[in-house]
Design a protein with these regions (language model features):
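P-loop NTPase catalytic nucleotide-binding module
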Residues: 1-19, 37-38, 105-233
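P-loop NTPase switch module centered on the Walker A-proximal segment
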Residues: 1-104, 110, 153, 186, ...
Length: 234
């Protein structure tokens, strides 16, 4: 099926080794209906680790391109190796991507490889998102992880999604004004922080928000939100 360029997204998954980039790729491919079940690193059945050597040692050495479709959008995912020896190989994919997704292991927090990848994405003027993986691991303090992210990359790093208090699901903080109790903070607080930051890049929206006191609809936030993502705040 042919796609227009407006309907294609190119996202590279970057970050330290053992952050879970390859298994995240498996989960996304499975959710997108591209594979019948998620592969296993131990069994050597992941899509990304396709060479014999990668299957033997249990970690990525090469970049791997996969794809899925979601609501009319064709998404190209580029899984990259995380060991520092392969930094050059991993960062080489950024020119082909619009967005760099920096994957962080919740048990480790912000590691040096995540900092280097964030810096590289910033220098190449890429949109950046941070994905906190392995949030269900034993002993994880998500609030501490979140504070560590803001300390490393700036207060403009805000949660778009938060896990529910019982960890059973993910709670959207962008489209919802309030909702389920979350693991820390609250949906309302997170939503307000996002809106406060988004309206800073749109004067007309700022006027509505401040002077008229109107509650902004998600549709009003969509384009300014994309603009805010592209602002080099950090």
């Amino acid at each position: 099926m042919p796609y227009s360029t407006a309907d294609i997204r190119n996202v590279c998954l970057v970050g330290p080794s053992h952050a879970g980039k390859t298994l995240l790729t498996e989960a996304l491919l499975h959710a997108g209906g591209k594979i019948p079940e998620k592969g296993s690193i131990e069994k050597g059945t992941t899509v990304s680790d396709f060479t014999t050597r990668e299957k033997e040692i249990g970690h990525s050495q090469y970049n791997s391109v996969c794809h899925l479709d979601h609501e009319g959008i064709h998404v190209n995912l580029i899984d990259t190796p995380g060991y520092r020896d392969f930094f050059g190989r991993a960062v080489s994919v950024m020119p082909a991507a619009e967005t760099a997704a920096i994957v962080i292991n919740a048990t480790e927090g912000v590691e040096e490889m995540a900092r280097r990848m964030m810096r590289a994405a910033h220098d190449q003027r890429k949109c950046r998102m941070i994905i906190v993986n392995q949030i269900d691991a034993e002993g994880v303090d998500l609030e501490k992880v979140f504070n560590g992210i803001q300390d490393a990359f700036g207060k403009e790093c805000l949660p778009m999604n938060l896990p529910s208090a019982d960890g059973s699901k993910v709670v959207d903080c962008f489209f919802q004004l309030e909702g389920d109790e979350t693991a820390f903070s609250s949906v309302g607080e997170a939503h307000t922080q996002i809106v406060d930051q988004v309206v800073e890049v749109d004067e007309a929206l700022m006027e509505i928000y401040l002077e008229q006191g109107e509650e902004l609809e998600p549709e009003q936030l969509h384009d300014p939100f994309e603009k805010a993502l592209r602002c080099l705040l950090y």
